[in-house]
């Protein structure tokens, strides 16, 4: 069908126009109309937009925009020439690799495995970066400014980086090989293999490091004596720390014996102050009745073990450990100096965009959602300690704004207050998910082990005491 006739047909189409039945059915199938309708040129163009457009050849593009076409073609050939030069250089370097039997982690045989490993680390880094930005309130919130977040096309940065590292590694090895060949040409014969010298001529082994300086160790008896004294002192201190002496506490077997011995002690103390002989005689008569207790106490067959019970117990010497106390104090000082800026930070300034990421489609926050389920183990410890610090401050005091900032951030502040109200709807569930088992004594005591990367053995093993009990609905 000719385009001119088709255009004329579309302009003069009317329902009263007589047309053959086969043509009418054909148009009805194409246009999906039960009956012929009025069609215009704009409707026809709109229908044609559903199909793929025709790609013009390069000759047509050269006539339409010659400057752009010329720049694209020149860029294409430059890239191609650059790629050919790099490929030639790579082939030469690979030949040298095969001759010298070098190995690289970025070689072609192992590139796929290391590429997957780097991609996995990159993915974890992005997740860690996003989650750490939620915790760190002092940094900028614009996560899109990082190259990884700008667009999906920038995902190729990692692959390009691997190629650059590989090219740099190959180029350096090629340059080192050239330098080694030049040095061999000046000093030795090129056709002489130096790796055969060590096992063909054993005399060369002693002449390998002729000009190397040798240090003769000097024996100092005083240093040996000091080291021996230090080891002895360390062993003594270790024995004293490991020795848990029990405290002996004697308890009378019966209350009657305890009362009788108490009366004897009171009478003996009173007799030292009495000067009247009659009173002394009367007291001595009363004491004779209970003197048999002393005989029983000092008899071998009965003695102290029969009249009393030993209720000794071992007391842990946790708080007597000077190393433990020193580590606790240094950890708290580091903690205070490191997070002083975070304590002074206003929580209403830059937390809107972070909370917005955890909103659902209905603008509500799920009650069963916990940040600890998506954080890394190290970041979980940071979240717990930061929450323990922020919980000490009143939100109403932090919500005081200036008049200028209140007018600018009125909408965002209202939204944050509404979100906080949604969080506090179910108090029992929030206590279960955040207070326990998040805040425990071993987390605050062992934060130097996870946060400051310092270890103190198993000294905190006895401090695992839960501050909060189990809470049931």
From Swiss-Prot:
Location in or out of the cell = Plastid, Chloroplast
Name where it mostly resides.
plastid
One Gene Ontology CC term in the entry = chloroplast
Which Gene Ontology BP annotations are present?
protein transport
Keywords carried by this UniProt record: Chloroplast, Plastid, Protein transport, Transport
The organism's place on the tree of life at top rank = Eukaryota
What do we know about how this protein assembles, alone or with others?
A: Part of the Tic complex.
Q: Which family does it belong to?
A: Belongs to the TIC214 family.
Protein name as it appears in the record: Putative protein TIC 214 C-terminal part
* Organism of this sequence: Anthoceros angustus (Hornwort)
């Amino acid at each position: 069908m000719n385009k001119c006739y088709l255009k004329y047909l579309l302009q003069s189409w009317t329902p009263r126009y007589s047309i053959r039945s086969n043509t009418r059915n054909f148009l009805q199938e194409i246009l999906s109309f039960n009956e012929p309708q009025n069609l215009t040129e704009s409707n026809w163009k709109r229908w044609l937009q559903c199909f793929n457009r025709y790609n013009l050849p390069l000759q047509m593009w050269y006539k339409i925009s010659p400057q752009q076409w010329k720049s694209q073609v020149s860029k294409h050939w430059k890239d191609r020439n650059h790629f050919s030069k790099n490929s030639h250089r790579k082939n030469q370097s690979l030949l040298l690799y095969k001759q010298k039997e070098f190995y690289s982690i970025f070689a072609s045989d192992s590139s796929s495995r290391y590429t997957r490993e780097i991609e996995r680390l990159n993915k974890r880094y992005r997740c860690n970066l996003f989650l750490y930005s939620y915790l760190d309130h002092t940094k900028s919130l614009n996560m899109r400014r990082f190259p990884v977040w700008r667009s999906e096309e920038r995902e190729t940065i990692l692959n390009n980086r691997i190629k650059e590292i590989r090219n740099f590694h190959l180029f350096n090895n090629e340059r080192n090989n050239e330098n080694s060949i030049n040095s061999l040409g000046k000093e030795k014969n090129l056709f002489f293999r130096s790796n055969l010298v060590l096992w063909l001529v054993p005399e060369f082994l002693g002449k390998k490091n002729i000009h190397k300086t040798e240090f003769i160790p000097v024996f100092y008896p005083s240093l040996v004596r000091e080291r021996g004294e230090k080891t002895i002192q360390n062993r003594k201190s270790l024995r004293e720390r490991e020795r848990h002496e029990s405290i002996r506490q004697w308890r009378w077997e019966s209350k009657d014996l305890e009362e009788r011995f108490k009366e004897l002690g009171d009478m003996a103390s009173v007799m030292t102050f009495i000067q009247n002989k009659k009173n002394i005689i009367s007291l001595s008569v009363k004491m004779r009745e209970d003197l048999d207790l002393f005989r029983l106490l000092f008899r071998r067959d009965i003695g102290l073990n029969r009249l009393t019970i030993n209720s000794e117990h071992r007391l842990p010497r946790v708080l007597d450990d000077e190393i433990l106390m020193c580590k606790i104090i240094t950890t708290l000082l580091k903690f205070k100096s490191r997070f002083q800026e975070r304590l002074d930070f206003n929580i209403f300034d830059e937390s809107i965009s972070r909370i917005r990421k955890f909103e659902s489609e209905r603008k509500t926050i799920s009650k069963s959602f916990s940040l600890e389920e998506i954080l890394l183990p190290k970041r979980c410890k940071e979240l717990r300690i930061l929450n323990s610090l922020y919980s000490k401050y009143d939100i109403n005091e932090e919500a005081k704004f200036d008049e200028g900032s209140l007018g600018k951030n009125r909408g965002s502040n209202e939204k944050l207050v509404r979100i906080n109200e949604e969080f506090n709807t179910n108090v029992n569930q929030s206590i279960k998910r955040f207070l326990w088992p998040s805040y425990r004594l071993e987390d605050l005591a062992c934060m130097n082990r996870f946060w400051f990367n310092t270890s103190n053995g198993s000294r905190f093993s006895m401090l695992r005491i839960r501050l909060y009990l189990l809470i049931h609905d």
